[in-house]
Amino acid sequence: MGMEEWQGVIDDPTKYDIHKANQAAFNLPSRLIAKVFLFRWIYRGSAYAYSKDPDFTPVSKSVDFWQNVIDQYYTKYKKLHATHLNYIKQATTTGIITSPFGREYTFAPKRNKRGDLVWSENDITNWPNQGCGADVMAVARVAAFQRAKRQGLRGLFISTVHDSIVADVEDVEQEAWIKLFDEVFRDLPSLVTQAYGVEWNIPMLGEVSVGPNMLDLTEVKL
C-alpha cells in the first residue's frame, strides 16, 4: 500500500482551508460542522447517527439528507473510499492490516446485541488512521526533544494530546520554543521518511499556541 492511499482527505493544505471548501461544496452551515462531519465520516459514521446527533440535527434530522452528504464525500474523495473498502476486505479476510510503517492491526468479529458476529467497520477504518498519526507524532516528539537538548533549552515536555505536543517553558525561552516547533513540523515529512524508510508525500502544517494553561491559549502567527 503506497503513501498516496494514506493521503486521504488532504488536497493541498498549503493552498486553502479544506473545511471551508467542504462547507461550501456540500452546503453545510458552518466550517465547524464541515470539520466534525469530515472526521466522523473518515471512520464510517452512519447517516442514522448524524440524523440523531444534537450537533447535526439543527442541520437536518433526515437520514436521507445525511446519506446524500456521505455519498458526496465519497464521490469527492474516491481514493479514500477505495482505501476504506480495501481495509475492510483485508480485515475481514485475513484479520490483519499492515500500515506503510510496518505496524500490524489485528481484527476479529464480535457479537452484537442480537448475538450475531459482525465486523466493526469503524474500528477497521479508525485504527490504521489513528496509528499512522501516532507513529508520525512519535517522530515529531523525538525530533523536538533532540533539538531542545542540543540548544540547551530548559523547558519540559509534558504530554502529547492527539497531534499536539505540550511543553512547559519559561517566558524567556518562549520564542526559541516557538521557532523549534515550527521547524520540526516543517521538517517532519523528511524526518518521517528517514525514520520509517517510506516516502512521505503529504505536506505538514504546524501551529503553535502559548498560554498559562491548556485552556487559555493564543495562537502565534508564524
Regions found by a protein language model. Name each.
Residues 1-222:
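Conserved catalytic core of nucleotide polymerization and phosphodiester-bond processing enzymes
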